Amino acid sequence: MKKTFEHISVYVILLLLVTKISFAQSTEVITASKSEIIQTPCAGSTQLQGVDPAWMVMINHKPIKHPTTDQDQELVDRIKAEKQLLRQELLNSIPTPEPEALQAIPVKGTNFQGNANSGWTPLDNSVAISNGGFIVSVTNSNIKMYNTSGTSLYTNTLAGFVNISTITSAFDPHVLYDNVSNRFILVTLSGTTPTTSRLIVCFSKTSNPVTGGWWVYNINGDVLSNSKWFDYPKIAVTNGELFISGNMFSNLNIFDQSVILQLNKTQGYSGASMSSVTWSNITGAPGSILPIGHGHGSSY
């Protein structure tokens, strides 16, 4: 595994570019603390059995209204107004394109009802489509699969999909299609305390996410073993690895730091024990890091 992780500095720089909002060259050195290589055994596999939506159990947490005071609301409104003003100024600065430069109006193909809001706010919707025409759509907190004609092939809750007895609810799902490996990857979370936080990573066994089955990994969300829980995951793949970023919070829901997990996706596709490292204490203490997958030299 040493060779797998020796070029991490390149990936970390790519992962952190989104926080710079600049395309100028920089000599800034970005550093991070690297954990030991961790081996996570596969928690099992799941063979999909759909659930009739009329009987699909949905568990929603009681909402907490924010902000809690008029002063807080005034501050939020002022920030929104300032952002809207900056956005409009940016739009006004963009020159109007010449008529010949305008692109042709896209033609709508198949149109069908998608994965509806299950009552969570925010919706946290994510969708991926394969070269073979399979569509995997996730929201808080359900999953649906279709073909490109709009035929529903599978419906379930996220907890029902991962099929782990200790997981009764899941949230913050993200799904992507890995066009190099012709597989799907789905990541979701469970638990909002250091002792209950779980990071669930699922790999489709074949190119068919409906009938081919999935490998499921149940990772401790307290990734640094310092009594923090994992939130706001974002994902990306390279030729050999899966990157998952997330924000760590204390038991009092106070932000601690953002971290990056680097996992061996090839092992995940085979259901083997999966190697991973965690990167923390990143230069500049960025928050809400968005991983960037590099180009694969092929297209959808």
Protein language model annotation of sequence segments:
Residues M1-E28:
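Bacterial Sec-dependent N-terminal signal peptides
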Residues Q25-Y300:
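C-terminal PAP-associated
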